[in-house]
């Protein structure tokens, strides 16, 4: 299918884009900043500017696609809910949705009109409902979040041509690596400073990132799917259950609960995000045959963060799609000398030598570099070697207490998807993490941003 994806640069959008391409679909990403998207989108696609104010341009960009997926919307957790921010939360959801509907109206008599429109809402539709079991037929709640969701859904339905199949997913709290709720709370848990929020009895309607992506794929490609579906796992979890399981997996203690009054003072009106309770069930999707990979919170968290190699780690994950085949990309990245090309000049990075003629499991590689002017020696060992799919190097000696780097390579649509995952620890334990951690994190991120830029210069991308 030819699919137009609005919101492709977001947390769900990036995962979904990869899954769509893996499934053989042709994707057009409609984005606010095309130049930024060209560097950061980890899947091959056509990139168009998304300008909901220009209806003629939008209709032209949507024409010829079979389906539209709309994930647009500013993050609801990121900033304080000032009057201006609340207006942005409404407008960033409702205006793009309404603009897409108007574009579909203008195309309704055209052979190039899309026939499927999947758009998102959220379980915030139901409001704070305590222990009440909620499904797609439940009434909306009261408050800011239900009001946003109600207007969002109305915008998708109003004046939509009858020939267009509409699917609306009320998405729960999405759990995945590198973003969403887990991206915010995992560093807190790893530092050993986590505890229940309020009583801990409030319900969390969550969903694993893999399952929400697969539900979107299922709904777009299944012509019988229509109307509203709760995109939530079959087994909701209390905040206490979530906290206990995540702390257990990262091997850190649970501190005293954060009292409700403290959270309300600290977060203001946003406290409802952590204190509100929605016990939502995905009855619609299950009754129509959708199967979940991760049904309970234990399964999901074990998959996402059950492999920390040491407690208290920091982590970075970076993905990039390059427009050359795996047969060309892997040989370049397995050549340790090419690290000098991919590393920013401020590190004065040089490869000194290695213990074997060719890389293999057990190979030791020696480097020298300067970190903020301080000369350093770094030795790493290849602890896993499985060409051309992956290799793992582990620091033996160097500037970090721990540096564990997994390199993965996947053939994708004639090019190569590269995934880097680094788990690392700065020296001096908690003191080092608190004092130097933010600066180290900034350095690590800048190193990988430079690597992405250089790799794209060498091999091309979107």
Question: Which residue ranges define each predicted feature?
Answer:
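N-terminal Rossmann NAD(P)H-binding glycine-rich loop of SDR-like oxidoreductase domains
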Residues: 3-23
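NAD(P)H-binding glycine-rich loop region in Rossmannoid oxidoreductase-like domains
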Residues: 35, 39, 45-96
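Conserved Rossmann-fold NAD(P)-dependent oxidoreductase catalytic core, especially the SDR/UDP-sugar
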Residues: 86-88, 97-143
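Catalytic helix-loop patch of NAD(P)-dependent Rossmann-fold dehydrogenases
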Residues: 91, 95, 128-168
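NAD(P)-dependent short-chain dehydrogenase/reductase
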Residues: 157-161, 165-168, 172-203, 246
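Alpha-helical substrate-binding/gating segment
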Residues: 186-194, 202-237
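Mid/C-terminal beta-alpha module of Rossmann-like enzyme folds, strongest
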Residues: 215, 222-269, 303
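Hydrophobic ligand-binding cavity/cleft-lining segments
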Residues: 220, 280, 298, 306-356, ...
